[in-house]
Every structure is written in C-alpha cells, then in structure tokens.
Amino acid sequence: MICAVYKSGRRADTYLFVKKRDVFDDVPEPLMEMFGSKTLVMIVPLSKRDHLGIADIDKVKVALVEQGYYLQIPPPQINLLEQHKQELAFKK
C-alpha cells in the first residue's frame, strides 16, 4: 500500500494522507477548506514501514481503506505555566 502525504498550508504540523497523489475525492469538502493549500511532502510505501512519525501506521492503513484518507493533527501543546500552577497547588 502506497500513500501520498500532504502538509497543510493553514495549520502547523497537520498532514493529510491520501491513497493516490493529487486525488482528494474521498476527503470531505469542509476538511479540504480547513486544510488550506496543500504541499506534497512525500510518497510513502506503507507496506515497507514499521512506524510513521507520530501517526500509528495501523490506524493510517485502516483509515485509508475505510475512509480513503487519514488526517494527522499535532498533539495538544502542554501549557507549562498551567502545569506549574497545578503542581504548586498540589504542594500546598
């Protein structure tokens, strides 16, 4: 299985995996609008890979078969100030 990976021009660290290069028929229109301009990052042979950055390769494969695409969004950013405040509150 091979897929094309595109980087979002609108959202940092957001990637769209599709089954074929430049074929976005399975991707919902609202998602395409949110994604913004697309930049091809790479073509990936999934069958030859064990891991895929922060994405779970098995979830990517299933999503490509069932939906025709996979959207990778970055993990939520940790608010270090809030985390520090919570730690201080627990110490009281």
UniProtKB/Swiss-Prot annotation:
Species per Swiss-Prot/TrEMBL record: Shewanella frigidimarina (strain NCIMB 400)
Record protein name field: YcgL domain-containing protein Sfri_1738
Superkingdom field: Bacteria
YcgL domain mapped to chain residues: 1-85
Gene3D superfamilies assigned to the protein according to its UniProt record, in alphabetical order: YcgL domain
InterPro entries to which the protein is assigned, alphabetical: YcgL-like_sf, YcgL_dom
